[in-house]
Amino acid sequence: MSFVFRYRARVFSPLLVVLSALGGCAYVTPEQPRAPALPVLAKPAPFTAADAEFVQTLNTMDLAQIALAKSATTQAGRSDIALLGATIAKDMAAVQARLAKVATVHTLSLTDKPAPAEQKRIAWVQRAHGAVFDRRYIRYFASAYARIKPVLARQVATGTDPTVVAIARDVQTRLADYQAAMR
């Protein structure tokens, strides 16, 4: 009996495999429906002339702040001003890098030096040391903050490029924190 069983298994096993394979070929799959067209990608927010002007204004302010903050680390009379200067230099350099990315994307050129009038004010502050430097630096920072504050607020309210608006918000909060720390 075992011989007969083995014989049947040898005959029927390949037969079952062939029949099941042929059965799978007999079924014709219906044609797949066509994929719908891809939706149009959302266009990036427009980069307006106001955005470009803001990026350039913030760039010149950042350059001046970085130059004076680096001076504050060595010339400040108070240690808190020196530490704050190091923080401002690091943070504004990061903002500068973000502005450079935005400028590259939108083919905008940024200056690498502050305006000549700002350079004179920076040189005037940098000539001092100790407590005199602290007073001049705090006064300069307060006046620069007063000048840039409405520009930042306007950009946050009316800016069209979300990256530029995010930079404006970030700088707005950082400058307010620095101003509070200097008092």
Residue ranges, per PLM feature:
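His/Met- and acidic-residue-enriched segments that coordinate or traffic transition-metal cofactors
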Residues: 3-4, 25-183
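Sec-dependent bacterial lipoprotein signal peptides
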Residues: 1-25
